[in-house]
């Protein structure tokens, strides 16, 4: 239990630049408080102490503005920033290392019992105000943009924006961006994040240079390997 608390606090420091001390985080961070109490509420729910779990969750909603149903399954190192207006439904499943921001809804689209809320795989980020509705699956490493409305499965590593949500960056594009950032770091240049909906001619030129440098590096490595052979 103490290891879990320590891990949750560490996540706040890693993902929230405003975090300054452990005491401040414990006393004033609503996301941390909501997640910590949810761990206990979920245990109560699994022990079939449904009323007690719901009452505790209701109190947390009153104090933090974050509504997490005690039946929701949440993985390790889950981070909630700001938190106000977040709703996480009963059959929601959230993997490890996910982050969500204020105003996010993981909601259902049916009155029928059973699986009716979203599944977020590992390393998913959901931006402020986004709505993910129904028993859809958001693939590992996906990014859901602010105020997007998602009602279908999203593949691993994709970036989604708009209403209804549509994919603007696929995993291959993400791999290329990561490659550029790694090259930029090597040469001491802090590249901006790539966004297809806001093209910057200077950034595009820099991206082309970084792509070319990467290609030259690969060719040089290939030449060196050939020269080493007898």
Outline where the language-model segments fall.
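Structural signal for interior beta-strand "rungs" in well-ordered beta-sheet cores
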Residues: 61-168, 173
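Terminal amphipathic alpha-helical/low-complexity segments used for targeting or macromolecular assembly
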Residues: 1-59, 175-230
């Amino acid at each position: 239990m103490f290891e879990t608390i320590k891990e949750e606090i560490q996540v706040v420091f890693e993902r929230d630049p405003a975090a300054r001390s452990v005491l401040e985080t414990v006393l004033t961070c609503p996301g941390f408080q909501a997640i910590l109490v949810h761990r206990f509420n979920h245990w109560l729910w699994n022990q079939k102490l449904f009323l007690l779990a719901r009452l505790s969750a209701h109190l947390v909603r009153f104090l933090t503005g974050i509504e997490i149903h005690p039946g929701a399954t949440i993985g390790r190192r889950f981070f909630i920033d700001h938190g106000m207006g977040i709703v996480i439904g009963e059959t929601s499943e959230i993997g490890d290392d996910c982050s969500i921001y204020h105003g996010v809804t993981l909601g259902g689209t049916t009155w029928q019992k059973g699986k009716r809320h979203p599944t977020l795989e590992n390393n998913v980020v959901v931006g402020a105000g986004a709505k993910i509705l129904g028993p859809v699956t958001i693939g590992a490493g996906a990014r859901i943009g602010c105020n997007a409305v998602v009602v279908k499965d999203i593949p691993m590593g994709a970036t989604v924006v708009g209403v209804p949500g549509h994919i603007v960056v696929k995993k291959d594009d993400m791999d290329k961006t990561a490659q550029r950032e790694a090259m930029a770091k090597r040469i001491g240049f802090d590249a901006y994040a790539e966004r297809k909906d806001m093209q910057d001619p200077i950034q595009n030129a820099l991206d082309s240079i970084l792509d070319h440098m990467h290609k030259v590096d690969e060719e040089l490595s290939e030449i060196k390997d050939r020269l080493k052979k007898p």
